[in-house]
Amino acid sequence: MRGKLLIVVLFVVAVAGVVWLAQRRGALTLPGTSGSGGAPGASSGSQVTVTFVYGTEKRDWVEAAAESFRSKHRDVDLKLVGQGSLEAAQQILEGKIQPTAWAPADSLAMSLLESDWRTKNGTALFGTGEDAPAPLVISPLVFVAWEDRAEVLAKLGGGHITWKALHQALSADQGWPAIGGKAEWGFVKFGHTDPTRSNSGLQALVSMTYDYYGRTQLTVGDLLDPKYQAWIKAIEKGVTRFEASTGTFMTDMVRFGPSRYDLALVYESLAVSQLENAQGRWGNLKLYYLPTTLWSDHPAAVLQGSWVTSDQKKAARAWLQHLRSREIQEQALRLGFRPADPAVPLKNQDPSNPFNRLGPYGLQLDLPPAAPSPDGAIVRNLLSMWTRIVPRSP
């Protein structure tokens, strides 16, 4: 009996010795310890959690990129949360969500949050250097329209679809016949998203305002002008519903044809994904570019909130670097995005690249000059003005 007890004691001592040596050499991380503390991607017994909140327009691209990232970074627990840009900005401000990194659809949403965050907390939410906001992919705002309707509007706008031409069309009580269209087309039916909920709707409002004033430098006083407000209201009267999702417009245009929308304002990437599906159903659906380009630059940044640890920042940087790598940037092309990396050409030998084949549908490589984004204070007042003058269904 004593012999058996001695064997058990010796076994326990041996195991304890092995564990002690392993810990001394850093080869074993026990539950509850911080791990090796090395760079993201190093072997570790525990994972660093990175919560990445992103605009849903790039869901397919982000999810595909996450698969390859996870295979290389086993020590990073990457959590993806797709959410509308303006909704996410408000929830971050209110503390309802606390992401490690954020990538809205456009810098407008980021500028709005940065302004509101400074006002509320007196600190910066976004960093500088490697943590500063920088684009992942880019996509311009475009009109997508049925070709026969677009030709009438372009004639009215001197060869282009402009907001002034659209204002005239939407204000006509006699509908399409008043501007040279067919009586069976009825009233002009235009669509864009709710500016208070969706980035593309906010961009639409910015674009209208730039076109009205003929300049991109705005003041709060410009937004208080009654004539300007009446002009905006006349355009919005022709929007039958303010959807929360830009993708809804493309789906509905293909599904219901011009009975639902004659034209809509969407991201180029979304239009590209549906153009070929639409052909032959209701006529030709094509892209038309705004006279001044507004980019959705899909900026991403590691947040400087108190809830983000140094290990999480390291892991988040590795994730964003992965998204900006050449391989992942080239994958974005197949989904209709323009790579943020200027070294990645829009045209290549990939047969699945839409930029190689969709020129006949209006897709262009070279675009009109780009307009700058307004600052956060202008954006906040623009949204306040819109909610005051535009009636919406509950």
Predicted regions located by residue number:
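Extracellular/periplasmic juxtamembrane helices and adjacent flexible linkers that interface
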Residues: M1-P31, G305-P394
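Extracytoplasmic/secreted envelope proteins and their assembly/folding machinery
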Residues: R59-A66, L86-A89, S107-M110, E114, ...
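Periplasmic-binding protein-like
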Residues: G129-F143, Q229-A244, Q279-V308, K313
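Ligand-binding clefts/hinges and TM-proximal coupling segments of bilobed small-molecule sensing domains
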Residues: I161-K189, L323-D350
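Ligand-binding pocket segment of bilobal, Venus flytrap-like solute-binding proteins
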Residues: Q203-Y288
